[in-house]
């Protein structure tokens, strides 16, 4: 996703804004009223709202088709100039209406302290002509897009009709839709792949708390039932919680970082999520990438973008901290590590097995697997999984012992356990570039092969060492 590859365009549709920052110094109180006197220092203009999502997506290397509503005014020109600094953003689908001013939020700052915010906006619903123009623009952008983002700030652009048209256009092309919501309930977003409320938005939509991970999962489930899709809750210092329609839940802790400003951090996370999905990452891995991007954003002052180089470096640091070579990690941590490897352009290979008594046949399989790419992930059946497959007398070595042996193999970079009878859910979460199994399987028999190939990966069947198996070793030892 962060490697130098061509990404599918991202259509960002929503409420675009101008964020103006006036900075200066304060050393006294006005004699006219009990307010500080700011000595003007500088001003800067940056994209805000949906435009900030577009800027962040472009900074991460994605082509962007921006759909929004601006006026015929100086603020619109300033926004266009600010967006022009990010190569890859197309404004061809923007709608201009002289009757409506461009939304502008002016923040007056002294150092890192915000003194006041001044909003210049009209939040009335769009009239029929504006709505028709927005629908046409959205449909045209979605026709070219690989991912659709609806950035809803409740400023009038994303009406029921515009949302419905966007959902229909995306469904017709089988394009995923991510929504950053601003409504009190999420029914209007029916058809979305994923909705990403923050804690306040989730509470308003469900009336449920999110203090604990279990609370957040229950509230996310209630929200997901409203529109029929997955829910990612951004929980500030508590990290992120992903609830999926099949009942799976993923909790990602927040990365420890000094927080300077939360302005626009949600936009940054949303953009990183969309870019990651456009790059072929799984949703689970994309959540980890979005979490890392948000951590970088809050360390910056004001509405800011996170660049591809910054995010790649952060992911590399995270991967090194989580998993030294051969480490046994959770599925969630494996997602983060694999995402970091892919961000570096590394080719990730996956194989799996019980690996109870390691023999030359296993070694050959692992060596041939490692030769297919740059990093090898080995998924091990847990003890319970092995017993279900091979009977109560197996495994001979427990899962921790087997994982340690695997991790000591110099060709193995990461070890992850799975408790199911097959590694399908792990494959779906990691989405490796190459899936390797022995040549005793037919391609249609390999679990997860369809998932990997549908994502642009490949299945490789490697030769086995004749006469070498754990079962034969066990039988020989018992005679």
From Swiss-Prot:
GO CC annotation: cytosol
Span list, region Cytidylyltransferase: 350-479
Reactions the enzyme catalyzes: D-glycero-beta-D-manno-heptose 7-phosphate + ATP = D-glycero-beta-D-manno-heptose 1,7-bisphosphate + ADP + H(+); D-glycero-beta-D-manno-heptose 1-phosphate + ATP + H(+) = ADP-D-glycero-beta-D-manno-heptose + diphosphate
InterPro entries assigned: Bifunc_HldE (IPR023030), Carboh/pur_kinase_PfkB_CS (IPR002173), Cyt_trans-like (IPR004821), PfkB_dom (IPR011611), RfaE_dom_I (IPR011913), RfaE_dom_II (IPR011914), Ribokinase-like (IPR029056), Rossmann-like_a/b/a_fold (IPR014729)
UniProt GO BP: ADP-L-glycero-beta-D-manno-heptose biosynthetic process
Pfam families given in the database record: CTP_transf_like (PF01467), PfkB (PF00294)
Known partners and oligomeric status: Homodimer.
Family under the similarity heading: In the N-terminal section; belongs to the carbohydrate kinase PfkB family. In the C-terminal section; belongs to the cytidylyltransferase family.
Protein name as annotated: Bifunctional protein HldE
Organism annotation: Azorhizobium caulinodans (strain ATCC 43989 / DSM 5975 / JCM 20966 / LMG 6465 / NBRC 14845 / NCIMB 13405 / ORS 571)
Gene name of the encoded protein: hldE
């Amino acid at each position: 996703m962060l490697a130098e590859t061509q990404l599918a365009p991202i259509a960002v549709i929503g409420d675009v804004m101008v964020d103006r920052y006036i900075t200066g110094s304060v050393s006294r109180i006005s004699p006219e009223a009990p307010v500080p006197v700011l000595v003007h220092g500088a001003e800067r203009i940056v994209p805000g709202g949906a435009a900030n999502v577009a800027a962040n997506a472009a900074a991460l290397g994605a082509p962007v088709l921006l759909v929004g509503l601006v006026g015929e005014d100086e603020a619109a020109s300033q926004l266009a100039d600010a967006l022009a600094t990010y190569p890859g953003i197309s404004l061809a689908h923007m709608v201009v209406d002289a009757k409506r001013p461009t939304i502008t939020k002016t923040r007056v700052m002294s150092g890192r302290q915000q003194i006041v915010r001044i909003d210049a906006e009209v939040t009335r619903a769009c009239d029929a002509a504006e709505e028709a123009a927005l629908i046409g623009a959205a449909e045209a952008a979605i026709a070219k897009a690989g991912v659709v983002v609806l950035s809803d700030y409740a400023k009038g652009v994303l009406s029921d009709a515009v949302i419905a048209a966007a959902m229909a256009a995306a469904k017709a092309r089988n394009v995923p839709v991510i929504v950053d919501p601003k409504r009190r309930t999420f029914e209007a977003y029916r058809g979305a792949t994923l909705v990403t409320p923050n804690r306040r938005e989730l509470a308003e939509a469900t009336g449920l708390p999110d203090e604990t991970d279990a609370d957040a999962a229950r509230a996310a489930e209630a929200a997901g039932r409203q529109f029929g899709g997955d829910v990612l809750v951004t929980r500030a210092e508590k990290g992120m919680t992903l609830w999926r329609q099949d009942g799976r839940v993923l909790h990602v802790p927040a990365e420890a970082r000094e927080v300077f400003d939360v302005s626009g951090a949600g936009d940054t996370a949303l953009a990183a999520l969309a870019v990651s999905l456009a790059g072929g990452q799984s949703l689970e891995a994309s959540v980890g990438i979005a979490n890392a991007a948000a951590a970088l954003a809050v360390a910056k002052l004001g509405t800011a973008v996170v660049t591809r180089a910054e995010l790649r470096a952060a992911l590399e640091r995270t991967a090194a901290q989580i998993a030294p070579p051969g480490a046994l990690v959770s599925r969630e941590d494996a997602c983060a590590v694999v995402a970091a490897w892919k961000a570096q352009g590394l080719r990730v290979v996956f194989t799996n097995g019980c690996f109870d008594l390691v023999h030359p046949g296993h070694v050959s399989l692992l060596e041939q697997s490692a030769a297919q790419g740059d990093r090898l992930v080995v998924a091990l059946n847990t003890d319970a999984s092995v017993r279900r497959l091979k009977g109560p007398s197996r495994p001979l070595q427990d899962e921790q012992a087997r994982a340690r042996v695997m991790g000591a193999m110099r060709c193995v970079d990461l070890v992850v356990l799975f408790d199911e009878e097959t590694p399908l859910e792990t494959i779906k979460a990691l989405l490796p570039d190459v899936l390797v199994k022995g040549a005793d399987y037919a391609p249609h028999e390999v679990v997860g092969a369809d998932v990997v190939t549908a994502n642009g990966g490949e299945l490789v069947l490697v030769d086995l060492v004749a006469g070498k198996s754990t079962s034969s070793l066990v039988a020989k030892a018992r005679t």
